[in-house]
């Protein structure tokens, strides 16, 4: 199968698209990643097209993608009334495998140590989408260990640099956030929250 993954918005790598890339490649599918919503002149016909949008102001780009690919599956938090996860789409309870190769120049490890939020900010979808705060991953779960260096064209140890996407790091139980801080300190990680 030919699969198109489209990052509609956002500057950081999209975890949902990274999961889909991993899953489809594990199934033997050809995966094409782009941030363009319009079809390129030399793009093939696709068996399945995915789009992911985070922000509600991306509705116009979503519409453009759907004009180009009417059967595209568009997910993300851009629309509060329809929130589905990659796992729901794939019919799996959990799926935590990521294909970083669609972002060859991003060398940090990316993920969540907790999901949910105890705060109820009027503009935010997190409490509705994810519920109450809970711990989900250790630093060891998030750190990818090895990355393909596109400049040197070889695998190398991944830099000890993390982007934690947690919405409420200190909202998880204290013993968990303290354990994560110990892991960060002991592993000498640089962290961006």
Spans of features found by a protein language model:
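Ser/Thr/Gly-rich flexible loops in soluble cytosolic domains mediating phosphotransfer, phosphorylation
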Residues: 72-99
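Conserved SAM/AdoMet-binding glycine-rich loop
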Residues: 146-193
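Conserved residues at the C-terminal ends of beta-strands
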Residues: 6, 52, 75, 127, ...
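Short amphipathic alpha-helix with an adjacent loop that forms part of the alpha/beta core around
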Residues: 38-47, 63-66, 142-155, 182
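Conserved acidic residues
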Residues: 46-49, 122, 160
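A short, structured N-terminal alpha-helical element that caps or precedes a catalytic domain
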Residues: 1-71, 80-81, 171
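Residues that mark the start of a beta-strand
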Residues: 1-4, 30, 107, 120, ...
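Canonical Radical SAM [4Fe-4S] cluster-binding loop centered on the CxxxCxxC motif
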Residues: 104-152
């Amino acid at each position: 199968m030919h699969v198109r993954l489209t990052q509609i918005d956002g500057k950081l790598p999209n975890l949902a698209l990274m999961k889909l890339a991993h899953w489809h490649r594990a199934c033997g599918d050809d995966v094409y990643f782009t941030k363009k919503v319009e079809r390129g002149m030399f793009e093939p016909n696709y068996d399945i097209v995915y789009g992911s949008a985070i922000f509600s102001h991306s509705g116009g780009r979503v519409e453009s993608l759907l004009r180009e690919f009417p059967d595209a599956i568009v997910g993300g938090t851009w629309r509060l009334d329809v929130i589905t996860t990659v796992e729901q789409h794939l019919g799996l309870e959990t799926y935590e495998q990521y294909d970083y190769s669609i972002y060859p120049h991003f060398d940090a490890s990316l993920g969540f140590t907790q999901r949910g939020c105890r705060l109820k900010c009027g503009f935010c979808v997190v409490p509705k989408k994810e519920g109450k705060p809970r711990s989900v991953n250790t630093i060891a779960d998030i750190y990818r260990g090895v990355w393909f260096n596109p400049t040197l064209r070889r695998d190398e140890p991944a830099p000890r640099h993390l982007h934690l996407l947690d919405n409420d790091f200190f909202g998880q139980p204290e013993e968990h956030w303290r354990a994560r801080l110990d892991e960060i300190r002991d592993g000498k990680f640089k962290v961006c929250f």
